[in-house]
Amino acid sequence: MARFVVAGPSEYLAITGWGIDDVKLAKKAWVFAGQKCSRFDISPVNYEFNVEAMSSEKLAFNLPAVFTIGPKITPAPAPEVDGASNQRRVLMPESEEKLLLYAKLIAPHDHASNHVKQLVKGVIEGETRVLAASMTMEEIFQGTKKFKQEVFDQVQLDLNKFGLYIYNANVKQLVDEPGHEYFSYLGKKTQQEAANKAKVDVAEERMKGEVGAKEREGLTRQNAAKVDAETKVVSVRQQGIGLREEAKVKAEVQVYENEREAEIAAAQAGLAMKKAGWEKQSKVAQVEAVKAVAIREAELQMEVERKNALRLTEKLKAEQLSKATVQYETQVQESNAALYNRQKAADATLYEQVKSAEARKAQADAMFFEQKLAEDARLYAKQKEAEALAMVGKAKVEYVTSMLQALGGDYGALRDYLMIDGGMYQEMARVNASAVSGMQPKISIWSGADGAAGEAGAGAMQQVAGVYKMLPPLLSTVHEQTGMQPPAWMGSLPKDGAN
């Protein structure tokens, strides 16, 4: 059986069933057999919450808030064609879509159900806690307006999924959790700072009155002395400028010639330095890649320890900073007042002395500038000479490195070669000869082939064998007298007791 149903001024009808694909919204409609009609109120509702959140330093606080929330309704404009007012749309398409979401949310529940309130509360508390956990307590307190706006925006994004709109959001002042007195301490600190500032302002105004009269008298004397001193300074300065410009031109010519010679040497040195730098960067990059993981682990551990230290520091600071700040500022203001009186008394005398010194300084600067340019030219030439010596040293390093590689990394063979090439053995022989000159050193004589070297019938092989037999005692004697070891390629000293 059909019946005609009309919704109230702040109500809508949600009709489902026979002949309707999803949900039909209407202010009035015929409801036929096989259809179900539900009324739902679209009036905004106030939701009061007391959100308990925690900052990134684990400081708890309360955030009282009142949100006015309901479905967003935007009536469609009346059509321009006359006589079509009965056929116009009730809602704008976007509002009708959001109202459908709201109808599906609230229709299964009773009008007095707490379902929507619990949903809204869960969204607000969740977004508030997530946002607060990413900020410090100082950031939340200093940027309260920004914090409230971000909470509002994040909550609205989530409520859009249910067709709800925040008509008004009133987030009250942040409140301390029981047992946490962060905001209370901040309030006491502000009150004490205001009282101290008032005391300082009174003292400053009294000081300005007494100092003002003295300043006027001092300025009159200072200005007279200033004019006389500036006249003398200008005269001396003009003479110094002329001498300085002349010396500057001469020095620039000399510097230009030195620079041209230096650029040629620098270009050659730069190429060699770049090659070495590229090789160094390649090796450093490999080492850095290996060490990066260990460094990152250490940094993360340091960050955890730093956060713990900051939390303890903030707690102690809140307890002790207020008293220390008041005492410090009071002592500073008293010291500043006494210091200001002494400084003003000394300024007048100092000003006249400074101006006289500036005149003498300007004349000395001209002479110093001329000497400095000459010294700079000599210094530049010496620097380039040092760079050339450095390049020679680098070439020697590369030569030694290439020789070491050619000898297969045998450091002893390289050392022997360098000593032979540098005439070290000849020099050592000369020094040893001079050291034993006039002495009677131990002299050992060995005969080849057991004293048979003089026989006419001895063969060549016996002579060679005799030479080899003489080498061990010869090397031992050299070691005893000079402490030098034979080269590795020649052989080694005989062990104690060996023949």
Swiss-Prot record:
Subcellular location, record wording: Cell membrane; Membrane, Caveola
CDD domains reported for this sequence: SPFH_flotillin (cd03399)
Domain of life: Eukaryota
Transmembrane segments: none
Membrane topology: Lipid-anchor
Recorded coiled-coil stretches: 243-319
Post-translational modification, as annotated: May be palmitoylated.
Keywords: Cell membrane, Coiled coil, Lipoprotein, Membrane, Palmitate
Gene3D superfamilies assigned: Band 7 domain
Cellular component, GO annotation: caveola; plasma membrane; plasma membrane raft
Listed InterPro entries: Band_7, Band_7/SPFH_dom_sf, Flotillin_fam
Primary site of residence: membrane
Lipidation (S-palmitoyl cysteine): C37
Function: May act as a scaffolding protein within caveolar membranes, functionally participating in formation of caveolae or caveolae-like vesicles.
Recorded family membership: Belongs to the band 7/mec-2 family. Flotillin subfamily.
Alphabetized PANTHER family for the sequence: FLOTILLIN-LIKE PROTEIN 2 (PTHR13806:SF23), FLOTILLIN-RELATED (PTHR13806)
Protein name: Flotillin-like protein 2
Gene: FLOT2
